[in-house]
UniProtKB/Swiss-Prot annotation:
GO terms for molecular function: RNA binding. The lineage of its organism: Bacteria, Bacillati, Actinomycetota, Actinomycetes, Mycobacteriales. Involved in transcription antitermination. Required for transcription of ribosomal RNA (rRNA) genes. Binds specifically to the boxA antiterminator sequence of the ribosomal RNA (rrn) operons. GO terms for biological process: DNA-templated transcription termination; transcription antitermination. It comes from Corynebacterium diphtheriae (strain ATCC 700971 / NCTC 13129 / Biotype gravis). This is Transcription antitermination protein NusB.
Length: 182
């Protein structure tokens, strides 16, 4: 179980971290309820304007992440899956870890204003806060592997060039999605 310090550390974080955290919450909820994450955002925006509700306003950066991740979901999932070990599938990853990876990979690929190191560190922090003790390490390895080939991925490729570091560390990393299709 996470310590009280770890659970409340997000309160000391900046607005971007809180927006990422809210995006993870929304993507997680959308997958668990099998609904469109953009619809959840729209509902939360309406609810936050009503008197007598405890629903907080949705930060604009959360809206940007959620709408971007929803629009690019297939590509994000392909890219994440391309970096998993052969015996792992995207569905095998915990739902919360998928949400964290989708937010972090979206930032890596589609928001060049966020430094790569920041997107990686924030993803690892979210995994530390939300997930198991082993999740931060494999989230870090996967995001680092993607960051090493960021120019190819930003140009539209989903085939990783290399991922030996994460694989050598024993984390679930796959050589290439092209190998799976042959």
């Amino acid at each position: 179980m996470k310590s009280q310090e770890t659970r409340s550390s997000w309160k000391r974080r900046g607005s971007r971290y809180k927006a990422r955290r809210r995006a993870v919450d929304i993507l997680f909820e959308a997958e668990m309820r099998d609904i469109d994450p953009v619809a959840i955002v729209e509902d939360r925006v309406v609810l936050s304007r009503l008197n007598g509700t405890d629903v907080n306003q949705v930060p604009s950066y959360t809206k940007e992440i959620v709408s971007g991740a929803a629009m690019e979901l297939d590509r994000l999932d392909e890219l994440i899956a391309a970096h998993l070990a052969e015996d792992w599938s995207l569905e095998r990853i915990m739902t919360v870890d998928r949400a964290i990876l989708r937010v972090s990979v979206w930032e890596l690929i589609f928001n060049p204003d966020v430094p790569l190191a920041t997107a990686i560190i924030e993803g690892v922090e979210l995994a530390s806060e939300y997930s198991t003790d082993v999740s931060p390490a494999y989230v870090h390895a996967l995001l680092d592997s993607i960051a090493k080939n960021i120019d190819e991925y930003r140009a539209g490729s989903v085939t990783p060039v290399e991922n030996s570091e994460a694989e050598a560390a024993g984390y679930p990393v796959e050589e290439s999605i092209e190998e799976d299709s042959q």
